[in-house]
Amino acid sequence: MFRPILRLWLLIFVPFAILPFTLLSGNVVPSTALWGHAVFHLIYLPILVVGWWALWRFVREPSNLALRVIAALILLCQTSGLLGHAGELVSVVQRGFFSAPHSIFSENPHLFFAHFGLWGIVASEVLLLILTATAAVQRLLRRPPSATVGQASTSA
């Protein structure tokens, strides 16, 4: 059960932690270079699609209802993130893509889709933590109680 969850971490959490830091924060790509934002959309959209596909497979996989429900909620949030991210990309392409003006960040279509996508992605990150904790607790509860060393049954 932990291999599919590890796959979800690699497809959902890791790209969201690395890509904004490298392309949007100004630490690697200068914050004045708006092409970093467009490249972020181009790279992150296929990652979201692959993560959505992995979630779809995960929802059908576990026999545990709690894990299926949490994974279905993550799938719903990832769908919101995917649609919001695609909407952002479309609004950036309409305004000039790599040469889009800085004012695009305050314009309604980009802003709407940015909020729509960001909150879906953040909610899926939180739900991924909950999914992992739930799977870990259920794994601990399924373990058979081990016999302690040194206890002997006494018969009187």
Residue ranges and their predicted role:
Residues 12-19, 40-43, 47-50, 77-87, ...:
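Membrane-embedded alpha-helical transmembrane segments of multi-pass integral membrane proteins
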Residues 1-47:
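N-terminal signal-anchor transmembrane alpha-helix
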